[in-house]
Amino acid sequence: MKTPAHGTAVGGARRQAAACALACAALALPSAAHAQFAGTLGIDSVDRYRGSGTAAAGPVARASAMVDGPLGTYGGVSGLWRTRDGGFASADALVGWSGRLDALPGLGALSPDWGWDAAVHRNYYGPGEGHDFSEGMLGLLAPGWALRSWFSPHYFGGDMHAFYTELNASQALDDRWHAFGHLGWLHYGHNPSYETPIADRTDTLAGIGVTLSNWDLHLARDGLVAGHVRGDHDSQRRGPAWILGASVAF
């Protein structure tokens, strides 16, 4: 997210990066790309995280807010609720800092639309769940796409660290329609509790969306194309899924 003085494509790419980190609708916030504050309310047919389902079975509702600060700083919070019983599912918080690559020494010849991004992200699943974790991120931003890598020393609250690298892209088809895609790779670090290393995972997502005023409607398909989810997850959470959703920005 950028302040008004830096309203280039990097600002939109950074906002998209933060929105994805907070698990908002893929590359959403189309009507708020240059605001200092942006919020969304949305609903999705299913909650997915890095290519697999979560414990929040059924449709989920989400409320998110992002804010730009001075000198390229930004932050955001998001909450997720199950629609089947209205119960709390999870929450996220993100603080970050970003800027233009051409402002760095020796990189002045680069396009001002290219940028860098760094952030810290916290996932919270409620008291007593034991799955809360934090991760740090470094990213490269460009018009239409963002590449970033995340590192968590205690992935999902466990003793194992993990790296996750993702490429997110979006392409406008006309004034209303846009296509978006995602490719992610998860690598687990060594854990002496496991006799054999956990295999890497690769997930993908592809979808299409339409913007109607400040509403965004989207349909996507995601799943794993390599590796597998833990065996204690049921088949519905392990398999691919269609995601139908809507969000409104304000």
Q: Which residues does each PLM region occupy?
A:
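Repeated loop/turn-to-beta-strand initiation elements of outer-membrane beta-barrel proteins
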Residues: 37-39, 71-75, 102-108, 112-118, ...
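Detector for outer-membrane/organellar transmembrane beta-barrel domains
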Residues: 131-192
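Outer-membrane beta-barrel "beta-signal"
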Residues: 143, 206-216, 236-250
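Transmembrane beta-strands of outer-membrane beta-barrel pores
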Residues: 43-49, 79-83, 99, 122-126, ...
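Hydrophobic, lipid-facing positions within transmembrane beta-strands of outer-membrane proteins
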Residues: 59-65, 91-95, 116, 134-138, ...
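Solvent-exposed loop/turn segments connecting transmembrane beta-strands
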Residues: 50-59, 81-91, 124-133, 153-163, ...
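Cleavable N-terminal export/targeting peptides
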Residues: 1-38, 106-107, 250
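Short glycine/proline- and aromatic-enriched beta-strand/turn motifs that initiate or cap beta-hairpins
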Residues: 34-83
